[in-house]
Regions:
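Extracellular beta-strand ligand-recognition surfaces/modules
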Residues: 152-187
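Solvent-exposed strand-to-loop "edge" motifs in beta-rich extracellular domains
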Residues: 91, 103-111, 120-122, 160
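Beta-strand acidic-aromatic groove motif in beta-rich domains, primarily in extracellular
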Residues: 84, 110-123, 167
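Glycan-recognition and processing domains
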Residues: 26-91
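Extracellular carbohydrate recognition and processing domains
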Residues: 124-165
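Bacterial N-terminal signal peptides
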Residues: 9-20
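Extracellular/lumenal carbohydrate-interaction signature centered on repeated Trp-anchored short motifs
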Residues: 87-102, 144-146
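Extracellular carbohydrate recognition
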Residues: 175-200, 216
Length: 227
């Protein structure tokens, strides 16, 4: 009996050690190193990620649900469908083959039937993969539910190229002519975010970043510089 208890205790200790090693081995989120972001509005701000206007990418400052954001209007005075373009700073990432995640904070309005993400890829898609998206089998489109609330969607990218081939940008959002969309904040990350991503909480599950167990900074702190 005592021997069984002893072995059980040893197994529990081994499991605890393995869990601890896994936790410390996980890559910590670091702004400008493995994730970048932009907060959209009348005066957008961000780190190494910018929204860019195009001939088929026209936006307007807007307020939805009390939140300053950008609207991708439809219909609009431009060619084809309207899109919202984003450019990753080349100093962060340029070319190659990358697994990445794009986190989109959008207003869940029934004015748009869908929201798609098209990105510069190494896979199949228009213009040699420069606009790969849901229509090319990359993932499913977002189907807004009309809750009139701000929600978050995470796009998983498995074959990213991000070489500015999407009309000088790296990815874009669009309803493909099926209504206006509103976007507040966007994050681009080379580490996996949590499925229940909370834009106002630390990136991922709170983790110790040093022996004193200081937690990772929140998005609000990152943007204001406050501790």
């Amino acid at each position: 009996m005592l021997q069984r208890i002893r072995w059980t205790t040893i197994l529990i200790l081994i499991q605890c050690v393995l869990i601890s090693v896994g936790a410390f081995a996980a890559e910590e989120p670091e702004e400008g190193e493995n994730f970048i972001w932009v907060d959209l509005g009348k005066e957008s701000e961000g780190v190494l990620l910018t929204q860019s206007e195009q001939g088929d990418g026209v936006t307007e400052p807007a307020v939805q649900g009390g939140i300053d954001c950008l609207e991708n209007p439809w219909p609009y005075n431009g060619p084809g469908h309207n899109h919202m373009y984003f450019k990753i700073d080349d100093s962060f990432l340029f070319g190659g083959k990358h697994k990445a995640w794009i986190v989109m904070e959008y207003f869940d309005s029934n004015e748009a039937q869908e929201i798609d993400c098209q990105y510069d890829s190494n896979g199949a898609g228009p213009v040699g993969g420069a606009f790969r998206g849901a229509g090319d089998g990359a993932f499913l489109v977002v189907k807004p539910g009309g809750t009139d609330e701000w929600l978050v969607h995470i796009w998983e990218i498995k074959d990213g190229r991000f070489e500015n081939r999407a009309n000088g940008s790296d990815f874009r959002f669009s309803s493909h002519g099926k209504g206006a969309i509103w976007i507040n904040r966007v994050w681009f990350s080379t580490i996996e975010p949590p499925e229940d991503f909370d834009p106002d909480s630390p990136f991922g599950i709170p983790q110790a970043v040093d022996p004193t167990s200081k937690l990772t900074t929140t998005w609000a702190q990152l943007k204001t510089g406050k501790e």
